[in-house]
Amino acid sequence: MNTDIANQLRAAKKATTDLNLIQSDTRTIILETLAANLEKHIENIIQENQKDLSLMLEQDPRYDRLLLNKERILSLANDVRKVASLPNPLGVSLLEKSMPNGLSIKKITVPLGVIAVIYESRPNVTIDIFSLCFKSGNVCILKGGKEAHFTNSYLLLLIKNTLKNFNINTDIVCLLPPERALMTQLLNATGLVDLCIPRGSQNLINFVRDNAKIPVIETGAGIVHTYFDKSGDLGKGKKIINNAKTRRVSVCNALDTLIIHADRLKDLPELVETLSQKHVIIYADQDAYHVLDKNYPEQLLIKAKPQDFGHEFLDYKLAIKTVPNIKAAIGHIQQFSSHHSEAIIAEDESAIDQFLIEVDAAAVYANASTAFTDGGEFGLGAEIGISTQKVHARGPMGLEALTSYKWVIRGTGQIRD
């Protein structure tokens, strides 16, 4: 292992003791101070962010993820304040029992320990991760992508300067070099890192899962579907589809495939009408293409190929699949879903119930946009990632997901027969 990396990880592990001694009220004050520092240094953050942006083409789908402007920085500071205001997740009693032999048993929440998060071109994640880890008593190891190196480095400087002002050990957070070659060393750091959370492309997540010797929670990749049922309301459908697809195309909760009941194909041109205003390219199956031909801009309409389904576009692109019934819609989702977010637009309550019960995803929606799959929108303050697995945590991971528990047993001298 690279000596510098090994030393950083050892220092981080050692710092867990110092972090656990910080009182909850102090952690809250420090996070509020960090939020104020973000607002105070908006121009400096934008200046560093521009250095990163200058190395990327504006047409790159990652450009929007990388961009930090005044509005986004203010929102980021507000998210930190929301996390600061949340109840302390540590020391919460999950279970209390008094046993017949006189033993008192409690199950209480504790930090996970050292959490490593590997992410790509979203520098706001740097602040989200630190605020959630700090509030929940976890040391965090940050490994951002090279695309955001200047921005991440400056944000880390703000974090460390804030900690120094409170005489807090700054080893509780570190930013590893962006070189991908160092990732294997991190993934092999058994005994030093308690959990790794990859956030980014499916390739990144697959690499981490396949090469890690430390525990991993898979997050991020979202192949998202919305099914417009036979009973769907056209007005609701237009708004939901437009929002889910075009609000922010570069995020994991953005719509990738619209599934439509064959009986409602006549309404398809109106359903996707607003998408043409955002120049959304549609990859339509044969039935959908026949209906949209001459009803959607020719240069934006393409006949779908098999590989267009089950694809996370992260761009102004949408696949459309026609199905004869809800069973086929659910079957298509089961085949291609990444188990992130799936939605149905319907007025038939039995169809809604069937969809919500049978579709296997971290978040399932009825008559709402999948854009809501977000820690802030779920009232979690922020999120460290959106888990697409079932073990330990699922969906947006807030403070509660960053804790484990331990059993505390008090006795008066009892021994077991």
UniProtKB/Swiss-Prot annotation:
GO terms for cellular component: cytoplasm. Its main location: cytoplasm. Signal peptide: none annotated. It comes from the Bacteria. Coiled coil: none annotated. It is found in: Cytoplasm. Keywords: Amino-acid biosynthesis, Cytoplasm, NADP, Oxidoreductase, Proline biosynthesis. The keyword Cell cycle does not apply. PANTHER family: DELTA-1-PYRROLINE-5-CARBOXYLATE SYNTHASE, GLUTAMATE SEMIALDEHYDE DEHYDROGENASE. Belongs to the gamma-glutamyl phosphate reductase family. This is Gamma-glutamyl phosphate reductase.
